[in-house]
Swiss-Prot record:
Catalytic residue positions: D8
Broadest EC class assigned to this enzyme: hydrolase
Name of the gene: cof
UniProt keywords, alphabetically: Hydrolase, Magnesium, Metal-binding
The protein's name in its UniProt record: HMP-PP phosphatase
Family matches, as Pfam families: Hydrolase_3
Length: 274
């Protein structure tokens, strides 16, 4: 029997308009009533994710910044991982041949140099989380959890080649969304963060289930006892984890539908969405 459920937020738990549907909210509360540990694992900043949970009346553990931060259910930070100072310095000061915009995440917030398009801000309407305009090269080299590049996917694929050539195996690169490429501390991902959290709680990864849709969910989905892939997941994720169940679309609150079946039949081995 699984004792912890971990959920990606955007594209998984949230609908395309970045809201939590009523069925999803109800099933999350059912899990809490069953004394399951509920964990939200997201690329979002803590200052973005926590207000969403508070508004919904949810209390759970938080993995934020794609594994760079871990918080307990009272909001106490359990683990923090930053880019090494020399690497952060190189990311911020190297001239990358790209039109993608650069965004830096620190405990104090989201930093960028230019105004962010309104469509990017829609994802943060529930929390009110907003960027801070600053000259990125003036940021301290210490305390930078991750750097995100936003732009068209084809542009980011070219940038990914540059970053791999420059850093080799000194960082992890990950597509957290089709139009978002992230530079993360080496070995830092949702899977490693969930492993740390599960050990903190006295659990094994085999006792955890997880849901996700993007490449930043790959390690988490691959290492838990039961990983579930969204129907709207990136094709790369589905091809890399062909052994995992695929359920419906986040627009139809597929996580809620799946869990409603699972709560009635915990040993369910097929997807009720298909």
């Amino acid at each position: 029997m699984y004792r912890l459920a971990a959920f990606d937020m955007d594209g998984t738990l949230l609908t395309p308009d970045h809201r939590v549907g009523p069925e999803t909210l109800a099933v999350l509360k059912q899990l809490v009533e069953r004394e399951m540990v509920v964990t939200f694992a997201t690329g979002r900043h803590y200052l973005d994710a926590q207000p969403i949970m508070a508004q919904l009346g949810l209390q759970g553990y938080l993995i934020t910044g794609n594994g760079t931060r871990v918080y307990d259910d009272r909001g106490q930070q359990l683990q923090a991982t930053d880019l090494p100072a020399d690497i952060a310095e190189e990311v911020l000061h190297t001239h990358w041949h790209t039109d993608a915009s650069m965004h830096v995440f620190r405990d104090e917030g989201w930093m960028t140099e230019f105004a962010v398009p309104e469509e990017m801000l829609r994802a943060h309407h529930l929390s009110g989380f907003h960027y801070q305009l600053t000259e990125l090269r003036r940021l301290p080299a210490f305390g930078n959890s991750k750097v995100c590049f936003a732009g068209p996917h084809e542009e980011l694929l070219k940038l990914q080649v540059q970053l791999r050539r420059h850093f080799a195996a000194r960082v992890d690169l990950c597509f957290s969304a089709y139009e978002c490429l992230e530079v993360l501390p080496l070995g830092c991902n949702k899977g490693s963060a969930l492993d740390m959290l599960s050990r903190h709680l006295g659990l094994k990864m085999a006792e955890c289930m997880a849901f996700g849709d993007a490449m930043n969910d790959k390690e988490m989905l691959a290492t838990v006892g039961h990983g579930v892939v969204m129907g709207n997941a990136l094709p790369q994720l589905k091809s890399l984890l062909p052994q995992l169940q695929v359920i419906g679309h986040c627009e139809q609150q597929a996580v809620a539908h799946y869990l409603q079946h699972w709560l009635r039949s915990p040993y369910l081995t097929y997807s009720p969405e298909l």
